[in-house]
């Protein structure tokens, strides 16, 4: 506390929750206000997985209507919220000694962004692009042995960069021609969202270990089939309803692909999970659900929302924006 203000210690996370806490404490503190019975719920660890809310015993609550105050902006009301699901596809790897020249692929120049906020802008995903480059090498009968693959930092962030090293005995000029063709196609396809996208190819020192051609092709084929990005929007509101993001790819003892799946509908999250699980099983990989939290879908006939919107319009002359 400083000069009558409470400050977070070295973080701004939770500031929107803090506004909601203040609203509730002010209502509880002012005995002059007239209102129906209130049940104020305070939970912890929202930013790391809604841990407090997930552990709440809902049977202790008697109220039939709920107002969520996890919002810091004024003149805007939240009328729907995507639930989320974090998942990983894991594939065991068998390394072998490398005896071939090595090359590095680097995908960059992308804007990226939070998958919960800008996925509808359909920006390029570096992991998806890297997969596409490798798949087109296969289409042109170029054999490669994966040695490393690293893209993205967080499952819910659209990856801006991806770096991968592979070994190949095929002609470098032929490899370069394929990579350049894919890069030119991407520049045309993404000129409205990621005009600076690039795919860079260069010779590097040989790696000691790589995985086989068959295992490399299986991984790339599996990733190439996996859905990614913006899927569906609400026709009632201009909001994304279903999406998923191939946020992180890592190659170590295992090949791991981390996804963030988002939708206010559990059934939609289930469908995307089922697709990922099925594709993984086709290539002897494992689908693991890491975390799941619910959302809520838009209720077109909400009487409580209409009462609030009408009241603010009547008393403040403000037309609230719904998001």
Predicted stretch roles:
Residues 96-100, 119-150, 169-243, 276:
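Acidic-enriched catalytic cores of C-N bond-cleaving enzymes acting on peptides and small amides
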């Amino acid at each position: 506390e400083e000069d009558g203000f409470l400050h977070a210690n070295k973080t701004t996370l939770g500031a929107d929750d803090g506004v909601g806490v203040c609203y509730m404490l002010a209502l509880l503190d002012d005995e002059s206000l007239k209102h129906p019975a209130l049940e104020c719920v305070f939970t912890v660890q929202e930013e790391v997985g809604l841990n407090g809310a997930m552990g709440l015993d809902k049977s202790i609550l008697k109220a039939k209507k709920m107002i969520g105050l996890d919002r810091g902006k004024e003149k805007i009301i939240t009328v729907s919220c995507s639930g989320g699901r974090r998942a990983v596809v894991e594939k065991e790897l068998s390394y072998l000694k490398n005896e071939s020249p090595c090359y590095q692929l680097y995908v960059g120049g992308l804007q990226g962004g939070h998958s919960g906020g800008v996925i509808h802008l359909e920006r390029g995903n570096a992991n998806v692009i890297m997969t596409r480059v490798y798949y087109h090498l296969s289409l042109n009968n170029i054999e490669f042995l994966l040695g490393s693959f690293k893209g993205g930092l967080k499952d819910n962030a659209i990856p801006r960069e991806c770096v991968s090293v592979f070994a190949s005995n095929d002609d470098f000029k032929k490899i370069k021609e394929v990579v350049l063709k894919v890069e030119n196609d991407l520049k045309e396809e993404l000129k409205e969202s990621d005009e600076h996208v690039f795919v860079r190819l260069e010779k590097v020192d040989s790696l000691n270990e790589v995985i086989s051609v068959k295992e490399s092709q299986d991984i790339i084929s599996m990733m190439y089939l996996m859905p990614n990005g913006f899927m569906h929007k609400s026709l009632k509101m201009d909001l994304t309803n279903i999406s998923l993001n191939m946020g992180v790819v890592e190659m170590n003892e295992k090949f791991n692909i981390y996804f963030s799946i988002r939708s206010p509908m559990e059934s939609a999250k289930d469908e995307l999970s089922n697709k990922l699980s099925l594709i993984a099983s086709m290539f002897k990989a494992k689908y693991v659900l890491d975390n799941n939290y619910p959302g809520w879908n838009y209720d077109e006939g909400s009487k409580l929302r209409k009462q609030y919107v009408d009241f603010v319009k009547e008393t403040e002359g403000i037309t609230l924006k719904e998001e």
